[in-house]
């Protein structure tokens, strides 16, 4: 019953009517993390993701789905979503209790975590692919492949015994999981893409600027090119000199901003006398083929230039208006 509850909890969220989608590769998946500190304290967290965009959360206190966007319901009705929330609450309780009952036989296991990633992928021109992966304390434990539960290599006897149990005594669970990740999940994903197409396919231009800081202990200078606020995620940023990419350019991870856009910084370490002639080039689909190029030594962005021009003009206009008003008041007197 433990894994039956677990599978239903993790996978019943996706569902809905069919819709059109034209993505070469796109996925929807649920991530769940169950933390067990001791026999009497446990906490579960859940979230739903469209590729790398979080679309759903789970409120553990109220036992409700959190819809992070106005299109996160996809094609589900409110009644269907209410039924799912009830299932989530019921199975969360049962899952937590059963895990604690098993873990109580060996107190040395506390604290521990169980992590799950389950969902589906759509590839252009191919059949949908479903996946269900379970980890224990961050290490792969088992996965669902085709119609069979498979233990991860080197996972030990625990995963092997669980997989044997699922494969031979819970055929109904296996069939349910197969249908959910191969049929229900793709339908929900297509509905989600249709409902959120304006958001998912939007183009947001990056803001770019340059900065520098000394390199500790080397006497070198670190030149930093920042690109922020862009969407979608794919972006190309690099340091150049005379149209040649500079070796030694270090790219950081592309990180999410709170508004769903992305941020990247690219660093080049140079001698203090070498920055002249360097530039940073930013290429993104939102720019329509017109790359942003920032030259070191001339690195006021257009926003800053506009600010430098506009602020004095605003001050001048305010002074003129105040002077006219003051003069008119004096004339009346």
UniProtKB/Swiss-Prot annotation:
Residue ranges of every copy of the Ig-like domain listed in the record: 206-296
Disulfide bonding pattern of the chain: 120-185, 225-280
UniProt tissue specificity: Expressed on cortical thymocytes, on certain T-cell leukemias, and in various other tissues.
Role summary: Antigen-presenting protein that binds self and non-self lipid and glycolipid antigens and presents them to T-cell receptors on natural killer T-cells.
Gene Ontology CC annotations of this record: endoplasmic reticulum; endosome membrane; external side of plasma membrane; extracellular space; Golgi apparatus; intracellular membrane-bounded organelle; lysosome; plasma membrane
Location in or out of the cell: Cell membrane; Endosome membrane; Lysosome
Subunit structure: Heterodimer with B2M (beta-2-microglobulin).
Entries under Pfam families matching the protein: C1-set, MHC_I_3
Gene source species: Homo sapiens
Motif Internalization signal, chain ranges: 329-332
GO molecular function: endogenous lipid antigen binding; exogenous lipid antigen binding; glycolipid binding; lipopeptide binding
PROSITE patterns attached to this UniProt entry: IG_LIKE
All ranges on the Extracellular side of the membrane: 18-302
Gene3D superfamilies given in the database record: Immunoglobulins (2.60.40.10), MHC class I-like antigen recognition-like (3.30.500.10)
Signal peptide interval: 1-17
BP terms from Gene Ontology: adaptive immune response; antigen processing and presentation, endogenous lipid antigen via MHC class Ib; antigen processing and presentation, exogenous lipid antigen via MHC class Ib; immune response; positive regulation of T cell mediated cytotoxicity; T cell activation involved in immune response
Extra remark beyond the main annotation: During protein synthesis and maturation, CD1 family members bind endogenous lipids that are replaced by lipid or glycolipid antigens when the proteins are internalized and pass through endosomes or lysosomes, before trafficking back to the cell surface.
UniProtKB keywords: Adaptive immunity, Cell membrane, Disulfide bond, Endosome, Glycoprotein, Immunity, Immunoglobulin domain, Lipid-binding, Lysosome, Membrane, Signal, Transmembrane, Transmembrane helix
Residues bearing carbohydrate: 38, 70, 75, 146
Designated name of the protein: T-cell surface glycoprotein CD1c
TM region positions: 303-323
Its membrane topology: Single-pass type I membrane protein
Topological domain spans for side Cytoplasmic: 324-333
């Amino acid at each position: 019953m433990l894994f039956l509850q677990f599978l239903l909890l993790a996978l019943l969220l996706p569902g809905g009517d069919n819709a059109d989608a034209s993505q070469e590769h796109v996925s929807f998946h649920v991530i769940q993390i169950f933390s067990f500190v001791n026999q009497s304290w446990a906490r579960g967290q859940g979230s739903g993701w469209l590729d790398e965009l979080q679309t759903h959360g789970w409120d553990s206190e109220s036992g409700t789905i959190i819809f992070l966007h106005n299109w996160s319901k996809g094609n589900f009705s409110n009644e269907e979503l209410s039924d799912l929330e009830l299932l989530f609450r019921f199975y969360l309780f049962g899952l937590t209790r059963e895990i604690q009952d098993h873990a109580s036989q060996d107190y040395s296991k506390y604290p521990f975590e169980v992590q799950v990633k389950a969902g589906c992928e759509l590839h252009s021109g191919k059949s949908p692919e479903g996946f269900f992966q379970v980890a224990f304390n961050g290490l792969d434990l088992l996965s669902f492949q085709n119609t069979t539960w498979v233990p991860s290599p080197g996972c030990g006897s625990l995963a092997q015994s669980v997989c044997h149990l699922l494969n031979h005594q819970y055929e109904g669970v296996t069939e349910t999981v197969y249908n959910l990740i191969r049929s229900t999940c793709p339908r929900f994903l297509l509905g989600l893409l249709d409902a959120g197409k304006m958001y998912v396919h939007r183009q947001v231009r990056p803001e770019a600027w340059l900065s520098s800081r000394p390199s500790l202990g080397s006497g070198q200078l670190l030149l930093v090119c920042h690109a922020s606020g862009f969407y979608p995620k794919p972006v190309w940023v690099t340091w150049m000199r005379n149209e040649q990419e500079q070796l030694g350019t270090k790219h950081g991870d592309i990180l999410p901003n709170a508004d769903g856009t992305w941020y990247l910084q690219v660093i080049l370490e140079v001698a203090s006398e070498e920055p002249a002639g360097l530039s940073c080039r930013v290429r993104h689909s939102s720019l329509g083929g017109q790359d942003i190029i920032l030259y070191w030594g001339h690195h006021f962005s257009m926003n800053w230039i506009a600010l430098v021009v506009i602020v004095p003009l605003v001050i001048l206009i305010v002074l003129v208006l105040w002077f006219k008003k003051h003069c008119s008041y004096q004339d009346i007197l």
